[in-house]
Regions:
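A short secondary-structure junction signal
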Residues: 157-163
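Juxtamembrane luminal stem/stalk of type II transmembrane Golgi/ER carbohydrate-processing enzymes
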Residues: 2-20
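Active-site nucleotide-donor binding segment shared across nucleotidyl transfer reactions
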Residues: 41-74, 78, 83-84
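Short, His- and charge-rich active-site/binding loops that engage polyanionic ligands
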Residues: 164-169
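Short acidic/polar alpha-helix capping motifs at helix-coil junctions
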Residues: 2-8, 27-29, 53
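Conserved catalytic core of two-metal-ion nucleotidyltransferases
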Residues: 11-13, 21-47, 90-155, 173-219
Length: 219
């Protein structure tokens, strides 16, 4: 038995019952995720926007030849400076059965990571850990893929550490208000996005990149 089948057969990853009392596991989500990524691919190709599979989705291709067996979403990365173009492309070209959420289009999008969520409208799935900043956009509980925008960050370790420390001081009260008090602090989110933009512009040519200014990794 190959690795993928062994993992799947020994870990059903039950998603619970639907409204018709039928049990589902994560494998039932994968065909919809494939539909979503193919739609994103179509839109990006039409508008000449580069993208790449990232994080768990890239790992799944390498280790399993497809999805990680327990993965219930897909991860995609784009360049930070392509965000405005992707917003316009999704507004103009995304198919009617899909929807997208992002801060640049809807200030109710309170999520810090990812930058975008693209959803399949004719679906419903509720993220279990709602306290980790649930998407507050209307009708946002469909099956989705995540898109992160990669941005440059400082190479110098001291500057890097200072940025992380500063960012976390801004992030912690935002998360506390949104996740636990259920208050959406619009002003705090704007300041975080302004910081993101400032860092991205200052370190545009840096070989160090991050999906936000608070979770860095080396490219």
């Amino acid at each position: 038995m190959d690795k993928k089948n062994f993992v799947v057969d020994n870990n059903p990853y039950d998603l619970g019952k639907d409204v018709y009392k039928k049990h589902h596991d994560v494998r039932d989500v994968h065909p919809i995720l494939l539909t979503l990524i193919l739609e994103l691919d179509r839109v990006c190709r039409k508008n000449n926007i580069p993208y790449a599979l990232s994080f768990g989705s890239a790992l799944g291709i390498v280790n399993y030849g497809g999805f990680i067996p327990w993965d219930d979403d897909m991860d995609v990365a784009i360049d930070y400076f392509d965000v405005p173009r992707l917003v316009d492309a999704l507004k103009n070209d995304l198919g009617e059965e899909f929807a997208f959420d992002c801060y640049e289009d809807n200030k109710r999008f309170n999520v810090l990571i990812p930058t975008f969520k693209i959803r399949y409208k004719n679906s419903y799935i509720k993220e279990k850990y709602w306290y980790t900043l649930p998407n507050r956009c209307k009708n946002s509980d469909g099956i989705f893929i995540d898109i992160v925008a990669l941005m440059g960050i400082p190479e110098d370790p001291k500057e890097h550490y200072k940025l992380i420390k500063y960012s976390k001081r801004r992030m912690v009260p935002y998360v506390a208000l949104d996740a636990f008090l259920r208050i959406h602090p619009y002003g705090m989110k704007k300041k975080l996005k302004d910081l993101e933009r400032k860092v991205a512009e200052e370190y545009r040519d840096s070989p160090m990149v991050s999906q936000t200014v608070i979770i860095p990794f080396q490219d």
